Structure formats: C-alpha cells, structure tokens
C-alpha cells in the first residue's frame, strides 16, 4: 500500500468507483482515500470526474431507496469545493468512440471516463479498474497505491 507519494500530478481525475468507495466508506480502500481527500483539501486542488459519475453513483442508493446514502452522494457530487463534474460533451463522446474502437476491453462507460480525463488534461487517473491501464496517455493509479497520510 502507498507505493506513490504526494504530490500527484495535477489535475487528478477519479473514476466513479473512487467516489462510491469514498461515500460508502469501502475497505480496504478507505484509509488511502481518506488521505487522498485530505491532501486535495489541504492543497486546494480540484478533482475531476465525468457527469456520468452522477448516474453511476446514484443508482445503488436509489435502487435501495436509501435516502440517507443518496443525500451523502449528492452532497459530495454537488457541494464539494474541490470536486468538478465535467460534462459529457460531443468531443468526449467522439474520443470515447475512438477508445472503444481500439480498446475492446473498455466498456462504454469506462471509455467515457477515459475520454473525459484525456480531454480535461488529467495527469493522474485514480481507479480500481485495471482495464484503464490499456489507455494510452493515462497515468493510472489504484487506491492501494495511494500514499496514506
């Protein structure tokens, strides 16, 4: 755990699973993610994610009719000072199509996340999905590799 050190290259992009792990406090990822969020808050850094993360993160609480968990997701998504939602634009979709065409293991939502990160110029992409390693231009970091602080 913690094979990297801060500061990570800015800007940082997070996949939907990172937001879900954070809000649902999923172990064994939570210790490293707690340190990550402390670091971004202390540095005043903006963390990027796609608006697609709204859909991906709210399905579980809505399906379970868990209003408390839904409210926690909405708070982080819409009220966090250092989380920026990037729109799913036409240029993102065009780039996602290219990624899907050349990386068959990449599913459509993942291609949208990768394209969003690339279009936004994200230097670091934090995810727990190994298939992102196949995307050229992304420096992929797993939660287990984040430094704990």
Q: Which residue stretches match the model-derived regions?
A:
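Conserved glycosyltransferase catalytic-site signature
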Residues: 16, 51, 109-114
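Acidic, PIN/NYN-like endoribonuclease modules and their adjacent C-terminal/linker elements
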Residues: 1-7, 11, 114-149
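Acidic catalytic patch
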Residues: 25, 52-53, 80-103
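Short active-site oxyanion
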Residues: 42-47, 82-84, 121-124
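Short, flexible helix/strand-to-coil boundary loops that buttress conserved ligand/catalytic motifs
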Residues: 23, 61, 100, 136-139
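Short, well-structured N-terminal submotif of metal-dependent ribonuclease cores
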Residues: 1-49, 62-75, 130, 147-149
């Amino acid at each position: 755990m913690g094979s990297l050190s801060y500061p990570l290259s800015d800007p940082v992009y997070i996949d939907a699973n990172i937001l879900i792990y954070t809000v649902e406090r999923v172990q064994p990822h939570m210790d490293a993610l707690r340190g990550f969020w402390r670091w971004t808050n202390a540095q005043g850094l903006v963390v990027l994610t796609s608006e697609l993360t709204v859909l991906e993160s709210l399905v579980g609480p809505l399906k379970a009719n868990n209003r408390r968990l839904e409210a926690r997701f909405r708070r982080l998504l819409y009220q966090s000072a250092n989380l920026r939602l990037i729109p799913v634009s036409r240029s993102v979709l065009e780039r996602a199509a290219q990624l899907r065409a050349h990386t068959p293991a990449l599913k459509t939502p993942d291609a949208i996340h990768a394209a969003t990160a690339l279009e936004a110029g994200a230097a670091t992409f934090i995810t727990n999905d190994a298939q992102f390693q196949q995307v050229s231009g992304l420096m992929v970091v797993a939660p287990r590799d984040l430094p704990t602080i």
